[in-house]
Amino acid sequence: MNCFIAYFDYLGFKEFIENNDLDYQKKIIGNNFRDLESALGQGKIKDVHHGVIADLSNSKINCINFSDTVVFWTNDDSNESLKELLDVSYKFNWQAVDFFFPARGSVVYGELFYVDFKQSNEGGGQYNLN
């Protein structure tokens, strides 16, 4: 099935890893994760026992982040999905550029095949095959 896909690449990520200690890296990466969730929640928040978090309950956008790459995609090719993807992409890019890393990206239309490789073993451990 066709969908809309937004691909982003953080610029300067290699230098960030090479020039900063692990504690600082964890802080900044944690902030990036927070900003990804904030973009997906489009500014909506919900109360939880330890404060507030982004409310992703109504988001229809999928996201995967690995190393210096972020990919968002829709579940279909409707105009509503495209609008939500563009809104999420705009908020993510704005936050990335303004607070942490410049990011370059693109939005494309096409087919995406996603396989969840998460597996569990008999001992309760989880691993990923990709």
Task: List each model region and its residues.
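Active-site loop/short helix in cyclic nucleotide turnover domains
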Residues: 10-22
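Short, glycine/charged-enriched secondary-structure capping and boundary segments
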Residues: 20-23, 120-122
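A generic fold-level signal
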Residues: 5, 65, 124-127
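Active-site-proximal structural segments of metal-dependent nucleotidyl cyclase/transferase enzymes
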Residues: 1-9
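A short alpha/beta connector and helix-capping loop motif
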Residues: 21-34
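Conserved helix-loop-beta segment at the catalytic/binding core of cyclic-nucleotide signaling proteins
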Residues: 33-72, 99-101, 108
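Catalytic beta-strand-to-alpha-helix segment of the class III nucleotidyl cyclase homology domain
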Residues: 74-130
